[in-house]
Amino acid sequence: MSNKTVVETVTALVEPILAEHNFELYEVEFVQEAKSWYLRVYIDKEGGITLEDCALVSDQLSEQLDSADPDPIPQAYFLEVSSPGAERPLKKEVDYQRALDQYVNVSLYQQIDGHKVFEGYLRQLSPDELTIEYMDKTRQKQVVIPRDKVAKARLAIKF
């Protein structure tokens, strides 16, 4: 079974479990690292996910996967259910919306104003652009970044 099919199947199995507990699905990935396969399910909720929440979803999803016929994942794998973390990637539009006025790290495909990475506050968001407020030495500046220039974006922790 292809990785994409596994992800789609697991997504269909886990969404009703998450809906029952008012959790949301952040991402499902099925990857091979060294010789082992990992099924990773990232979940979230308003106020943040707890270890108990992850254990609950892991137990219920494990039951669903074990009882599914035919077996959606015939090879051996490790199931991991977790939060996307404090420095979670911004992938979907809803992730960017939630990150408004949050401290973010944005990596670019090519430089803008001599920088390829900006770390600052996401102040504005449009379908085509992001506006980041950042510190350049001791001065506060803003940069408007076209979305097609963004290689990666994530929440960041300000030190």
Curated annotation (Swiss-Prot):
Required for maturation of 30S ribosomal subunits. Disulfide bonds: none annotated. It holds the Pfam family DUF150_C. The gene is rimP. GO terms for biological process: ribosomal small subunit assembly; translation. One of its GO terms (cellular component) is cytosol. It is found in: Cytoplasm. It comes from Limosilactobacillus fermentum (strain NBRC 3956 / LMG 18251). SUPFAM superfamilies: YhbC-like, C-terminal domain, YhbC-like, N-terminal domain. The keyword Protein transport does not apply. Belongs to the RimP family. This is Ribosome maturation factor RimP. Keywords: Cytoplasm, Ribosome biogenesis. The keyword Cytoplasm applies. InterPro entries: Ribosome_maturation_RimP, RimP_C, RimP_C_sf, RimP_N, RimP_N_sf.
